[in-house]
């Protein structure tokens, strides 16, 4: 089956969509991606053919599907609406798998919500009658190193681990770290695409209790070596749940609200930073 992922990444959007798509992509043998070449994107790190799009036009995507005869379109993109999905289906007949994080209407054959809070009943009346709904933690897309790390009982090197995603455009990592006691050893994980990286590096230099990890190869191990995690209410939550870690989730964008609400109801520590 020829599979096309439609997804983007950038220093503004972050890396979460592409990262989880790459985990799902391993389930298929013939995979390609269609992405806009945005600033700070992960296009060069995608180990599959990438079609660089010229625009957000749905017709450009439709033409690509027709020309390359893709059989399954996987949409992981907040900018593609239910009406766009209807148009794609009408024009191409392609099978559609749609990611969803906000309990929104979709016109798809398979609906995938990988967040722990999600239930199939949430989508009654929101998706076509014959749509296959895949929801909840059992469908979580978690990298293999987390499953391996969940078996390890590591010595705790760090009092706190902070990660606000790969880009952390609001520079929350620095803000959170500066509010913690200076007697505590704090690890901060980020990426070289973080627009606030220089500020973080300067902060780490001035504080000998801070350990800054940039593009670290094994985030799972870092998390497992920490007494408490302070993480965004994103896919990091599924990873923390798998590790059975002590964590606090920070909600700072709208698409994290459902996860944050569910965590709070379950008794987990949640903080909102808008």
Swiss-Prot record:
Keywords: Hydrolase. InterPro entries: PseG. Substrate binds at residues 15-16, 143, 234-235, 239. It is an enzyme of class 3 (hydrolase). Nucleotide sugar hydrolase that catalyzes the fourth step in the biosynthesis of pseudaminic acid, a sialic-acid-like sugar that is used to modify flagellin. Monomer. Belongs to the PseG family. This is UDP-2,4-diacetamido-2,4,6-trideoxy-beta-L-altropyranose hydrolase.
